[in-house]
Amino acid sequence: MSELIKSQESQSYRLAAQTRTNKKVKSLAERKDRAWYIARCATTLLKEDYGVKRVVLIGSLASGKGFHQRSDIDLVVWGLDEKKYYQAVGRLLGLNPEFEIDLIEAENAPPNILIVIEREGISL
């Protein structure tokens, strides 16, 4: 009898663990979808309001590797007026408080970062 109870308890624990895992996976997938949406909104804002010529997404959102509940959005831009950098960052952060957005000016990026951008980045 105790063997049957242990088996039922074990099955119950496994089912609960699987349910939690499924919820986490779904939650992460939904967060990733929201991050992509915000990245596209940020691209539109940067191009229309700040005259940015090109926007490339890099990092875990672009690669799909290592994206997690605290991942941010990494955008590289070409053609942003240096005097408007902080204003643009402020506007981007106001798009959605759930995400931090790192804005990298390609003109000031080190050469090794530019190689990564060209190899792994996604143009938006």
Which residues does each predicted region cover?
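Glycine-rich beta-strand-to-loop/alpha-helix junction loops that act as flexible
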Residues: 57-60
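Catalytic core of pol beta-like nucleotidyltransferases
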Residues: 1-53, 63-69, 80-124
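Short hydrophobic/aromatic beta-strand micro-patches
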Residues: 76-78
